[in-house]
């Protein structure tokens, strides 16, 4: 029994052993950083996946689903293509003299006039789209000896037959079609775009009935260029009741140049010119609805925000848009390395510093202090080191956007069948550019993330070194980001350490004296926990032995009866 009492006494002494910081003559001060229960994984130069407290997504992967009409002027083509609006298809008259920043062509657009083709359709479409206007000036061409304003039932304008409003179909007058030779100088200081064409009858009979001659010819020239077109007579697939066709051509006349038109038949003559402008206007095929909203960047899928440096919504864009990349996600670290706080810390829940883990719940700063002293425990953020890290990180996103977000537009590429090899080459070049930008984007983000993590680690180390230089021999590093302070350090003392006004000379003598008076042999926390657990187990075993001995003694005295039945 004496042995049991002695062991129990030893166990109680062990359990009652003071923790560092719980003694009135000492205190514990730990330095730590912010942590969250579930961080975000980012990529760095050295690690494919490293957890940080916070990160910002850099890839815009979705659109609004609608095209914003501000700040860009959007012109909805509705059921008209840009070329139909240019030629003056009757159902596109509403677009006469219109202007735009972006002309939106719809998939439902259709032609409703004389069937035609444009041999260099893509170039004409791109030229007019970039000009951003359908401003048309009528000129007084003199066509002597022919009938003007030809029309067709395939191109209804009101109840009667009609034709493209910007073109003049010339046919024979009586039984003659004289040779036409007309000149028109450009005395203005801007480029003029003339649209003209040639008619391809379906039969020889149609040819002679319209133009007398068995074969016509059209020559349009300037000082810089000349085009001679001969009609191809023959039947073609029927479109809107016609098997004949019109081919549309175009000529640009520079200031000081002269337009010369010579023809003996089949001429579809211009009525005037389109005033050409230089600008950033463009065209886009999209079925996204147009809405009243504000967005700098437009894609065929709809408008997208341009507050991110990259996007993978669509390769085709207009406005100040993020660069297109292949990646669905690229995360930029905007916080420090995340080390979630351990929920169980030994038998007594002792505090620990940044070397072991981070601290959750630090909402007022990234770096801070925790302490245990005679007045209890406490925590406070270090705003100076926090602000130093934030100042350097805040500009990262803006810098990445500045490097990648330029005001440009990526137009659609169109090529005819005969230009298939050019189309393949262009696609290869475009894909290579995207691959290069995707690689550059990933590398740029990885470099920035590496710098952020190194920076935040450095700020933590700076704060620790600053504290160590203040405490000097008055405290001892505990190896986990904490200091054991060998003098009484109340809350005012702790605050002086945090704000840098701590005077170690004031406490020097007390600290040195306490170093020698505190336990002769100080057990490390890991071994101490083991010994405490072993002592606890031995005590429980001895208590069980005592209880069993008491039961046996009671049975012998007859105070307890035990019946065993078999």
UniProtKB/Swiss-Prot annotation:
CC per GO annotation: host cell plasma membrane; membrane; viral envelope; virion membrane
Segments crossing the lipid bilayer: 531-551
Side Cytoplasmic, residues: 552-566
Keyword Kinase: no
Pfam families cross-referenced by the UniProt entry: Hemagglutinin
Function description: Binds to sialic acid-containing receptors on the cell surface, bringing about the attachment of the virus particle to the cell. This attachment induces virion internalization of about two third of the virus particles through clathrin-dependent endocytosis and about one third through a clathrin- and caveolin-independent pathway. Plays a major role in the determination of host range restriction and virulence. Class I viral fusion protein. Binds to sialic acid-containing receptors on the cell surface, bringing about the attachment of the virus particle to the cell. This attachment induces virion internalization either through clathrin-dependent endocytosis or through clathrin- and caveolin-independent pathway. Plays a major role in the determination of host range restriction and virulence. Class I viral fusion protein. Responsible for penetration of the virus into the cell cytoplasm by mediating the fusion of the membrane of the endocytosed virus particle with the endosomal membrane.
Annotated SUPFAM superfamilies: Influenza hemagglutinin (stalk), Viral protein domain
Additional information: Major glycoprotein, comprises over 80% of the envelope proteins present in virus particle. The extent of infection into host organism is determined by HA. Influenza viruses bud from the apical surface of polarized epithelial cells (e.g. bronchial epithelial cells) into lumen of lungs and are therefore usually pneumotropic. The reason is that HA is cleaved by tryptase clara which is restricted to lungs. However, HAs of H5 and H7 pantropic avian viruses subtypes can be cleaved by furin and subtilisin-type enzymes, allowing the virus to grow in other organs than lungs.
Annotated family: Belongs to the influenza viruses hemagglutinin family.
Disulfide bonds: 30-482, 68-293, 80-92, 113-155, 297-321, 489-493
Lipidated residues (S-palmitoyl cysteine): 555, 562, 565
Location(s), subcellular: Virion membrane; Host apical cell membrane
Annotated Gene3D superfamilies: 3.90.20.10, 3.90.209.20
Keyword tags: Clathrin- and caveolin-independent endocytosis of virus by host, Clathrin-mediated endocytosis of virus by host, Disulfide bond, Fusion of virus membrane with host endosomal membrane, Fusion of virus membrane with host membrane, Glycoprotein, Hemagglutinin, Host cell membrane, Host membrane, Host-virus interaction, Lipoprotein, Membrane, Palmitate, Signal, Transmembrane, Transmembrane helix, Viral attachment to host cell, Viral envelope protein, Viral penetration into host cytoplasm, Virion, Virus endocytosis by host, Virus entry into host cell
Assembly description: Homotrimer of disulfide-linked HA1-HA2.
Protein name listed in UniProt: Hemagglutinin
Signal peptide start and end residues: 1-16
Modification after translation: Palmitoylated. In natural infection, inactive HA is matured into HA1 and HA2 outside the cell by one or more trypsin-like, arginine-specific endoprotease secreted by the bronchial epithelial cells. One identified protease that may be involved in this process is secreted in lungs by club cells.
Biological process, per Gene Ontology: clathrin-dependent endocytosis of virus by host cell; fusion of virus membrane with host endosome membrane; fusion of virus membrane with host plasma membrane; viral budding from plasma membrane; virion attachment to host cell
Membrane-topology annotation of the record: Single-pass type I membrane protein
UniProt entry tagged with the keyword Glycoprotein: yes
Residues carrying the site annotation Cleavage: 345-346
InterPro entries assigned to the protein according to its UniProt record, in alphabetical order: Capsid_hemagglutn, Hemagglutn_HA1_a/b_dom_sf, Hemagglutn_influenz_A, Hemagglutn_influenz_A/B
Glycosylation (residues): 24, 38, 54, 97, 181, 301, 499
């Amino acid at each position: 029994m004496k042995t049991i009492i002695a062991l129990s006494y030893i166990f109680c002494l062990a359990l009652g052993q003071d923790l560092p910081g719980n003694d009135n003559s000492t205190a514990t001060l730990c330095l730590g950083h912010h942590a969250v229960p579930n961080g975000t994984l980012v990529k760095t130069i050295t690690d494919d996946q490293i957890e940080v407290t916070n990160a910002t997504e850099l890839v815009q992967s979705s659109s609004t689903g609608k095209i914003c009409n501000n700040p860009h002027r959007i012109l909805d083509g509705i059921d008209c293509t840009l070329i139909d609006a240019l030629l003056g298809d009757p159902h596109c008259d509403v677009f006469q003299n219109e202007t735009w920043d972006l002309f939106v062509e719809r998939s439902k657009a259709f032609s409703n006039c004389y069937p035609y083709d444009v041999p260099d359709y893509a170039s004409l479409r791109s030229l007019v789209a970039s000009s951003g206007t359908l401003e048309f000036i009528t000129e007084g061409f003199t066509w002597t000896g022919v009938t003007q304003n030809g029309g067709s039932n395939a191109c209804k304008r009101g109840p009667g037959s009609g034709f493209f409003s910007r073109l003049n179909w010339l046919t024979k007058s009586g039984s003659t079609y004289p040779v036409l030779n007309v000149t028109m100088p450009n005395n203005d200081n801007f480029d003029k775009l003339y649209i003209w064409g040639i008619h391809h009858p379906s039969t020889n009979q149609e040819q002679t009935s319209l133009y007398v001659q068995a074969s016509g010819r059209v020559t349009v020239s300037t000082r810089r260029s000349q085009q001679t077109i001969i009609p191809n007579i023959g039947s073609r697939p029927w479109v809107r009741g016609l098997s004949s066709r019109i081919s549309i051509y175009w000529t640009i006349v520079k200031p000081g140049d002269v337009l010369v038109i010579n023809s003996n038949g089949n001429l579809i003559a211009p009525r005037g010119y389109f005033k050409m402008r230089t600008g950033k206007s463009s065209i886009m095929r999209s079925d996204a609805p147009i809405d009243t909203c504000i967005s700098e960047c437009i894609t065929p899928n709809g408008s997208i925000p341009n507050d991110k440096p990259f996007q993978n919504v669509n390769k085709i864009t207009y406005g100040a848009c993020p660069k297109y990349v292949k990646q669905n996600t690229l995360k930029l670290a905007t916080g420090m390395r995340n080390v979630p706080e351990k929920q169980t810390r030994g038998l007594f829940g002792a505090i620990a510093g940044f070397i072991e883990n981070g601290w959750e719940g630090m909402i007022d700063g990234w770096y801070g202090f925790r302490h245990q002293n005679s007045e209890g425990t406490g925590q406070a953020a270090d705003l100076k080191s926090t602000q130093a890290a934030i100042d350097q990180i805040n500009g990262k996103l803006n810098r990445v956007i500045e490097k990648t977000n330029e005001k440009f537009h990526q137009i659609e590429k169109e090529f005819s069948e005969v230009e298939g090899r050019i189309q393949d080459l262009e696609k290869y070049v475009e894909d290579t550019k995207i691959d290069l930008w995707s690689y550059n984007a990933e590398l740029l983000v990885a470099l920035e993330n590496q710098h952020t993590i190194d920076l935040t680690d450095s700020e933590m180390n700076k704060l620790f070194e600053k504290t160590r230089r203040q405490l000097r021999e008055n405290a001892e590093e505990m190896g986990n980001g904490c200091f054991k302070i060998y003098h009484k350090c109340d809350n005012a003392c702790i605050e002086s350490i945090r704000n840098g006004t701590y005077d170690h000379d004031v406490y020097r003598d007390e600290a040195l004296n306490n170093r020698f008076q505190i336990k002769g042999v100080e057990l490390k926390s890991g071994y101490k926990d083991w010994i405490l657990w072993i002592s606890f187990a031995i005590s429980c075993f001895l208590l069980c032995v005592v209880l069993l001995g008491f039961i046996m003694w009671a049975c012998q005295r007859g105070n307890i009866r035990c019946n065993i039945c078999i």
